[in-house]
Amino acid sequence: MQWKLVLGCVSAAFLAMAGSAFAQQASTPPYGPAITLDDAKRAMSAAELEAAKNAWQVAITILDSGGNLVMFHKMDNTQLASITASEGKARTALTFKRPSKALDDAIAAGGAGLRLLAVKDITPLEGGLPILVDGKIVGAIGVSGALSSQDAQTAKAGADAVAK
């Protein structure tokens, strides 16, 4: 009987640790007004420049704070799967108010993080970031086509171009 209690405590501790990889942040930024077209163009240009200077062929998606498509670019010779992946990464970052890599990490950690796989229409891969202006989420950018870390680097260049 006592071993069941110990096993239960160990299991609970393991699940708590695995779930902490994706614990709700104490304070996530609120949603703000939709990203302006000028800011979206600035983010897109910066992301495209980052990808081009590194010879990465990527697809780049920018959504507004309501999840609506504002801009999309597919660079020459980008694999077709990157079209939907870039939008999925942006949508994931927007709906979870955090980089899409946070979900990637939570799932990779296993345990309770695997529950994220049950969430419909997420793309838990690195390369999606919320776009913040004045501390509010005005949209998100998603990039796909290179290595995930390179996608994230490209997305960061775009998000940083409009961050205030």
Question: Could you say what each language-model-derived stretch is?
Answer:
Residues 8-20:
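Bacterial N-terminal signal peptides
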Residues 1-8:
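Bacterial Sec-dependent N-terminal signal peptides
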Residues 22-164:
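Flexible, solvent-exposed loop/hinge segments and secondary-structure transition points
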